Amino acid sequence: RSGEIKRRRIDASVRRILALKLERGLFEDPFVNEERVDEVVGTPEHHAAAAEISDRTITLVKNEAGLLPLEPDTGRKVLVTGAGGYAGSAADQGDRSTLGSLAAAMEEFGVETEVYETGTDPDASRRSTAVAKAQNSDLVVVTTNKAWTSEGQQRLVKELLATGRPVIVAAVRDPYDLAYFTEAETYLAAYGYKPVSMEALARVLFGAVNPTGRLPVTIPEAEDPNAALYPYGHGLSY
């Protein structure tokens, strides 16, 4: 209650850390064998595990319009827009950015996509361009990245919803964003913006994976942080 930590508690924590290092042999051989990196890091087994974990964590928070799951192989034109977060790396093949990864994964289900990244704080010009592209699309998927801190992102979502086109909102970082555009009828939380999360999101959107994720936190109302908009543990399935 005082905010002070007893020395014996710190000592106990340090002992646990040192015991684990001893168990792992880090005192005898503390360095990484760089020649074995390719054998250990990024193996097919690791990628498969990451995909499975991502599939299980995507959370369908709202599906009020019954828009999901999407029907595959329709050839419909989908605008993939909004905030990114991941720009890819030099080792990536093709466009592995947040939106690029999502678009590519959606195209595997037989739709045509257009990517337009607006960034995490879109100005009026970028929002206007996104709206124009939305009006020429059959469906819009907009990603948000901590939109609760960005009025530009909040306005973007509201302006896209105002087009009358079907809009899917996917938070690619915190799930709290929904509190700032509660009129969105279709909302998911992906918790990540790298390719593995975007590929899992696409599988959920098209029903290849039935969403089983649950909110790990409560989403509070924007105007009253003590009131729950969606409670801890909430999550929908098909």
Predicted regions and their residues:
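Preference for extracellular/luminal or secreted protein segments
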Residues: 1-238
